[in-house]
Amino acid sequence: MQKLVILGSTGSIGKSTLSVVDNNPEQYQVFALVGGKNVELITEQCQQYQPRFVALDDEQAAAKLKENLTALGLKIEVLAGQKAIYELASHPEVDMVMAAIVGAAGLLPTLSAVQAGKKVLLANKESLVTCGQIFIDEARKSGAKLLPVDSEHNAIFQSLPPEAQEKVGFCPLAELGVSKIILTGSGGPFCTKPLNEFSQITPAQAVAHPNWSMGKKISVDSATMMNKGLEYIEARWLFNASADEMEIIIHPQSIIHSMVRYIDGSVIAQMGNPDMRTPIAHTMAYPNRIYAGVAPLDFFKLKELTFIEPDFARYPNLKLAIEAFAEGQYATTAMNAANEIAVEAFLNDQIRFTDIVEVNRQVVENIAPVQVKEIADVLHIDKLAREVAKQHILQF
């Protein structure tokens, strides 16, 4: 029985992880649940899974949760604040940590799990986007096992040779016969929408993804393809890939989740219905396989598989992310922080859809280049970039 901590249990990935646990109750025990402010849902999760610990970042929410659990007669220890979350992520009894807190808020808890040498199921993009080198170095030092949960990175991982899977972050792609990492993306809900209509896109339209069930922030990132930009940055770090070893393809059906091209002409792809329980189950059971509750792919119902070259005029955020990686860790950190603020402003009807990339670009251009050597540098840039982004938003 493996003990599992879920960082972000009330989010989309967290709920899918619990669904996989439901299908394999004899293999996994939920040791701790970690959430933000959704007291109602995490109360229900505590009733069902009865973890030993539950932690909320918000102290008032934690106090309310404690009342709820006491009223239900549940003897679950309720913790509050970041320090408690770090301690749960690195608890000596824990076997694996699902790192699924969205945004920069998930950075330090995930790092805590890595430094403790845990099996880390990495669903938090920002960990690598903001401090990729630090994460890879810490994982090598502690012996932590990094397993990518993002459907694209998980697909790449599955399509790589076993030697590469054992060297996440430092695998020698060329020596293993790999010529290209091919990152696929659906293109989002506006793949064919006329560009002159982009400024009228509403938050409700942007969060309605055609293939995947995701949270609001990630859905908007998919619509702007910032999601793919962040995944490009992640892939560069996870698979030790150069710019020349990366390729991005728009694949609207989201059936092929990513591919690896080899020097002998072979292309190995991972396919399946678009359901996050597949990569989650893969990382939880690796190197074995477990039932995920996902319907098998029916090839006879597939009408077509199409592939389109990315159009940077349609997806300027994707271009910005690629350029930011070339600039360095400070630029990707600043861009990520700006994007979180810009997407929130868009969802609150403060700026237009087309303004998101303008905020991101302005912040990246106005943050002075600095060398990122430690987490404190990352947190400083992140804070500064958020302040600059908020100032730019006031001008719209």
Curated annotation (Swiss-Prot):
The Swiss-Prot or TrEMBL record lists the needed cofactor(s) as: Mg(2+); Mn(2+)
Name the catalysed reactions: 2-C-methyl-D-erythritol 4-phosphate + NADP(+) = 1-deoxy-D-xylulose 5-phosphate + NADPH + H(+)
Give the intrachain disulfide bonds.
none
**What Enzyme Commission number does this protein have?**
1.1.1.267
Is this entry keyworded Transmembrane? no
* GO biological process terms held by the UniProt record: isopentenyl diphosphate biosynthetic process, methylerythritol 4-phosphate pathway involved in terpenoid biosynthetic process
Which keywords belong to this entry?
A: Isoprene biosynthesis, Manganese, Metal-binding, NADP, Oxidoreductase
Q: What are the transmembrane regions?
A: none
A molecular function GO annotation: manganese ion binding
In which residues is Mn(2+) bound? 150, 152, 231
Name the pathway it acts in.
Isoprenoid biosynthesis; isopentenyl diphosphate biosynthesis via DXP pathway; isopentenyl diphosphate from 1-deoxy-D-xylulose 5-phosphate: step 1/6
Give me the residues that bind NADPH, please.
10-13, 36-38, 124, 126, 215
Residues annotated as binding 1-deoxy-D-xylulose 5-phosphate are 125, 151-152, 186, 209, 222, 227-228, 231
By its UniProt entry, which InterPro entries does this protein fall under? Answer: DXP_reductoisomerase (IPR003821), DXP_reductoisomerase_C (IPR013644), DXP_reductoisomerase_N (IPR013512), DXPR_C (IPR026877), DXPR_C_sf (IPR036169), NAD(P)-bd_dom_sf (IPR036291)
**Zinc listed as a keyword:** no
Residue ranges annotated as coiled coil are none
What does this gene product do?
A: Catalyzes the NADPH-dependent rearrangement and reduction of 1-deoxy-D-xylulose-5-phosphate (DXP) to 2-C-methyl-D-erythritol 4-phosphate (MEP).
Query: Cross-referenced HAMAP family, in alphabetical order?
Result: DXP_reductoisom
Protein name in UniProt: 1-deoxy-D-xylulose 5-phosphate reductoisomerase
| Species per Swiss-Prot/TrEMBL record | Glaesserella parasuis serovar 5 (strain SH0165)
